[in-house]
Amino acid sequence: MSIWEYANPVKFMRTSGAILPWVVAGAAACTVTGLVWGFLTPEDYKQGATVKIIFLHVPAALMAINIWLMMLVTSLIWLIRRHHVSALAAKAAAPVGAVMTLIALITGAIWGQPMWGTWWEWDPRLTSFLILFLFYLGYMALWEAVENPDSAADLTGVLCLVGSVFALLSRYAVNFWNQGLHQGASLSMAPGERMAAVYRYPLYLTMAGFFLLFLALLLIRTRTEIRRRRLAALLARENRA
């Protein structure tokens, strides 16, 4: 069985419909359990209760970057192989990615204010995340502005290529520049820098929950986009008749 079989809308609708309830259940279980567990953890000796924002901020930030990279992959599949489901999946993922980026920006400001004494700083990672959020908005606006769906998919695919620079910059900005207020990677594996287990395990669970939540929303929104495309085709056929 080839993976490209799932680019067929009929095959995708059947398979996604079968797994969607399980994905939703897993997303709810992991997210709720991880967040409750996380917010019951003890306060950090340096950051106090504000450290608990990590259970929202880190999963949202990781998903914001990875969703854009997923959109890049599906857009490349569209540009190379012209599979419509991949283009619709990229379109469906964009609003979810925009919300994740916004959550990361807001929670980052709330988390950083007590530590930095300011709600915003033109730190490399913060700035690249803001630019990534603007790319998400531009991507969605471009889909709405171009009437022909195939042309819209082509143009947004090119935009994905450009925006991927900022997605990667958001991920590795702390490594590129030593200056800046933002701390290093929260899940660093370097000796002496690993997060305490009391925070690490609920964070892993919340990250899994956010991934499953994205997957559930992606399947739901892609299925909706396929139905819209089918309805538009039927209406166009009736108008020609």
Curated annotation (Swiss-Prot):
GO annotation terms (biological process) = cytochrome complex assembly
Membrane topology term reads: Multi-pass membrane protein
* TM region(s), chain numbering: 19-39, 53-73, 92-112, 126-146, 157-177, 200-220
> Record keywords: Membrane included?
yes
Domain of life according to the entry: Bacteria
Q: What is this protein called?
A: Heme exporter protein C
Please name one Pfam family that this protein belongs to: Cytochrom_C_asm
Gene Ontology MF terms in the entry: heme binding; heme transmembrane transporter activity
Q: Which family does it belong to?
A: Belongs to the CcmC/CycZ/HelC family.
What does this protein's UniProt record list under function?
Required for the export of heme to the periplasm for the biogenesis of c-type cytochromes.
Q: Localized where?
A: Cell inner membrane
Give Gene Ontology CC terms. Answer: plasma membrane
Q: Which UniProt keywords apply?
A: Cell inner membrane, Cell membrane, Cytochrome c-type biogenesis, Membrane, Transmembrane, Transmembrane helix, Transport
Query: Which organism is the protein's source?
Result: Paracoccus denitrificans (strain Pd 1222)
